[in-house]
């Protein structure tokens, strides 16, 4: 007796094989997707030796990091003492930050990026939050315009009259606004950022830079004025480094 099977029967192994192939492809993609997710997460953390730019900015493993949630005195800024006189709070803040990171690996966790392309980071040395330490020692304000993270540390510093809280001190953001308003009056078209060329390369100076007053712009040498920090960076200039 001749037994006949339908064509559907013979197609079933092929169908099952195709299903198996698809399943294997899907399974193979799962670890790939997990790897991509981990890589994206790893990109939000940088670790390495740090170089201090100023009291609230570091270079870590080639990444420019603005310490998130704090605002340190500018390099040219002075603050009032307990009873009389002033002290160079901007220089002291930068030097203290250098002490905190010197000889250590620094790990910074990203909280995003600012308009200049700098990572906004919370940075740690041996597990200790150095952003918090700068505020706690009275060497930076809690930058409450953008973050409430370090309000408690600022209250502690204020109560102890530590650092900037021992006398009168204009918050760094007010100091910058005042210096910019003053500098733009004498700058071409109100563009107050000085683009200087030195043996160390093309460097720009903000009106609150410690060397701003002494820098003379010579256009015939290729030096120039900038209207914004973003413009200076886009043109290939870098900020002056404190250390």
Predicted features by range, described:
Residues 3, 97-117, 160-184:
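A broadly tuned preference for mixed-charge, low-complexity surface segments
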Residues 33-143, 151:
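Electropositive
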Residues 15-30:
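Hydrophobic membrane-insertion alpha-helices, especially the h-region
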Residues 26-39, 176-181:
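Short, basic/low-complexity N-terminal boundary segments at the transition from targeting/disordered tails
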Residues 7-8, 29, 40, 199:
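Compositionally biased regions
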Residues 1-13:
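N-terminal Lys/Arg-rich, disordered targeting/topogenic segments
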Residues 140-148, 156-243:
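Mature, structured domains enriched in cysteine- and short glycine motifs
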């Amino acid at each position: 007796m001749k037994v006949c099977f339908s064509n559907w029967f013979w197609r079933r192994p092929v169908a099952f094989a195709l299903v198996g192939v698809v399943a294997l492809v899907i399974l193979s993609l799962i670890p790939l997707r997990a790897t991509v997710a981990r890589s994206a997460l790893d990109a939000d953390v940088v670790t390495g030796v740090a170089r201090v730019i100023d009291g609230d900015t570091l270079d870590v493993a080639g990444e420019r990091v603005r310490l998130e949630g704090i605002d340190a005195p500018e390099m040219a800024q002075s603050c009032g003492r307990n009873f009389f006189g002033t002290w160079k709070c901007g220089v002291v803040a930068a030097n203290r930050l250098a002490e905190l990171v010197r000889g250590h690996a620094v790990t910074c966790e990203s909280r995003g990026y600012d308009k200049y392309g700098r990572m906004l980071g919370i940075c740690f040395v041996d597990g200790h939050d150095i952003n918090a330490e700068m505020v706690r020692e009275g060497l930076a304000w809690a930058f409450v315009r953008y973050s409430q993270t370090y309000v408690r540390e600022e209250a502690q510093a204020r109560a102890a009259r530590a650092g900037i809280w021992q006398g009168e001190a204009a918050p760094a953001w007010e100091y910058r606004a005042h210096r910019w308003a003053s500098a733009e009056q004498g700058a071409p078209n109100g563009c107050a950022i000085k683009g200087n060329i030195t043996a160390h390369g093309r460097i720009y100076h903000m009106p609150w830079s410690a060397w701003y007053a002494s820098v003379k712009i010579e256009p015939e040498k290729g030096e120039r004025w900038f209207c914004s920090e973003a413009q200076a960076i886009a043109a290939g200039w870098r900020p002056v480094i404190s250390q």
